[in-house]
From Swiss-Prot:
Name of the gene this protein is made from: pgi
UniProt subcellular location: Cytoplasm
Name assigned to this protein: Glucose-6-phosphate isomerase
SUPFAM superfamilies attached to this UniProt entry: SIS domain
One GO term describing the cellular component: cytosol
Length: 527
């Protein structure tokens, strides 16, 4: 066996299929030899052991001293205690029942009206997961209409309020924050809450929190008597929260089967517990990533789902893969700068965009094609020109064109897209990420870079208030004047703060030239 990307024997030897899941995985167009894959197979003895310990409740997130329990969510019986098992089962049943009550009209607003919409407020995995759920699975005119605030962009918040202006009284406001202290959802929540109160609209009786017990958000929702509080466990990270209440509540509110979603994820987990390397799809997938990137992430991952409903999947994988694997240090404390960059959109659109570079430009990537075999049961398509067949042809053609230039790829094929298969697909990548992290000996479950960014942002927000207070006192100030009062190392941030404050704001008089920061003098003229 050699690294030939077009070997039929290699294709047959490394094609994985499961007839319970109806999912295929083909890694044959990754360049590797039998010796390389055999050597890697030996490493998986320790990988499988580590994942088994994780699932049994070991403190796998050493840096944060936490268990990692998202795999328990789809099979509560494997959780390390009966208390956790009972809690998970109760949460799932509570969400399912709540969804039915909302959709049936058993739970209505203060005016005895059925709810029509959901405004979902969440950042990172608390936004991306639900967006993936609704984009992939929601059928037209089924369930509640979903809108999202997954950023503190003032235009986004304003647009959402305008879009829902006539329906705010029948809108559920879902706020997701594990700790309750994340600034973005808190700021958006306060703006929406204030808008409702200023317009004599209900907030408390329409509001739902998804958070940890006894968090700041939990206490707020409890004291204000919000409509509902759903549990988000301490041992569930944001990027792996889609099989928790974060993903299950959207499923319930669009009238999809949350139990099928969980079952799909659970069956994929089960398939990836086998220690038979060549029959373990997550082992094969993570091995392909490892081999194509020489174990140090040399190649970017380009995700190309050939179905519009999975367009968000590449964004979802960006967080799952990059936040999990993008680490400066390994578990020994050695600098390794690990990571795999992820981007993508959808096929066949991308064939008319950057696939040109993928085939003929710099060879620094591998593709993951995602194929669906199903088609709508409709008579509107001409049998001679069925778009499904064209789409399949475009995928195979692109795959072939890339391999003809020795450009590497992986293909994942699903029989159909539904709750079950989406749950399985997500679980496959979650497991592959866990396996890859074990291969390269990094902690996949912390995010020190994200925390550093949060701290830096908090410092800037503190300076914003200091600058505002200083200008409120009166007088003219240059950037040097301001930095000399605070910290001479923050001249650039002070410039950005002043620019953001002054443009489009008549309360400030600016003298000087914005292209020459040292010439600027700012004074507040209106209160």
């Amino acid at each position: 066996m050699n690294g030939d990307l077009n070997s039929w024997d290699k294709f047959c030897n490394y094609l994985w299929f499961d007839n319970k899941l109806n999912i295929w995985l083909d890694i044959s167009k990754i360049s590797f030899t039998r010796k390389e894959i055999d050597n890697l197979e030996e490493k998986f003895i320790d990988v499988f052991s580590s994942i088994n310990e994780l699932e049994n409740g070991a403190i796998s997130n050493i840096d944060e001293n936490r268990q990692v329990g998202h795999y328990w969510l789809r099979n509560p019986s494997i959780s390390p205690s009966s208390k956790i098992e009972e809690e998970i089962c109760a949460d799932i049943n509570e969400i399912s029942e709540f969804g039915k009550q909302i959709l049936n009209g058993d739970i209505k607003n203060k005016n005895n009206q059925k709810y029509t919409d959901v405004l979902w407020i969440g950042i990172g995995g608390s936004g991306l997961g639900p967006i993936l759920i609704t984009d992939s699975l929601q059928k037209s005119s089924r369930g509640l209409n979903f809108s999202y605030i997954d950023n503190v962009d003032p235009f986004l918040i304003s647009e959402r309020l305008e879009e829902l202006s006539e329906k705010l009284s029948t809108t559920l406001f879902v706020v997701v924050s594990k700790s309750g202290g994340t600034p973005e959802p808190r700021i958006a929540m306060e703006i929406i809450k204030s808008h409702c109160e200023n317009n004599s609209l209900e907030w408390n009786s329409n509001a739902i929190a998804i958070t940890m017990k006894d968090s700041k958000l939990f206490k707020k929702a409890t004291s204000e008597n919000w409509l509902k509080i759903f549990n988000l466990q301490d041992w569930v990270g944001g990027r792996t929260s889609i099989t928790s209440s974060v993903g299950l509540l959207p499923l319930a509110l669009i009238n999809e089967n949350i139990f099928e979603f969980i079952r799909g994820a659970s069956l994929m987990d089960e398939a990836t517990r086998t220690v038979d390397f060549k029959n373990n799809p997550a082992a094969l997938l993570s091995s392909a990533w490892y081999l194509t990137g020489d174990g140090i992430g040399k190649r970017d991952m380009v995700v190309l789902p050939y179905r519009d409903r999975l367009q968000v999947f590449s964004k979802y994988l960006q967080q799952l893969v990059m936040e999990s694997l993008g680490k400066k240090f390994n578990r020994k404390g050695e600098v390794v700068n690990q990571g795999i960059s992820v981007f993508g959109n959808k096929g066949s659109t991308d064939q008319h965009a950057y696939v040109q570079q993928l085939r003929d430009g710099i060879d620094n990537f591998f593709c993951i094609f995602i194929e669906l075999l199903d088609s709508p049961s409709t008579s509107i398509f001409d049998k001679k020109e069925n778009p499904k067949e064209y789409l399949s042809g475009f995928l195979q053609g692109t795959r072939s064109a890339l391999s003809s230039e020795n450009r590497q790829s992986i293909t994942i094929t699903l029989e159909k897209l539904n709750c079950f298969s989406l749950g399985a697909l997500i679980a496959l990548f979650e497991r592959a990420v866990s396996f890859y992290a074990e291969l390269v000996n990094i902690n996949a479950y912390d995010q020190p870079g994200v925390e550093a960014g949060k701290k830096a942002a908090a410092n800037i927000i503190e300076y914003q208030q200091k600058v505002r207070n200083l200008l409120d006192e009166g007088g003219e100030y240059s950037i040097n004047d301001i930095t000399s009062l605070f910290d001479n190392s923050v001249s650039e941030p002070i410039f950005f703060i002043l620019r953001e404050m002054c443009f489009g704001n008549d309360n400030y008089l600016v003298k000087g030239d914005w292209s020459n920061p040292n010439s600027l003098v700012i004074q507040k003229i209106n209160s």
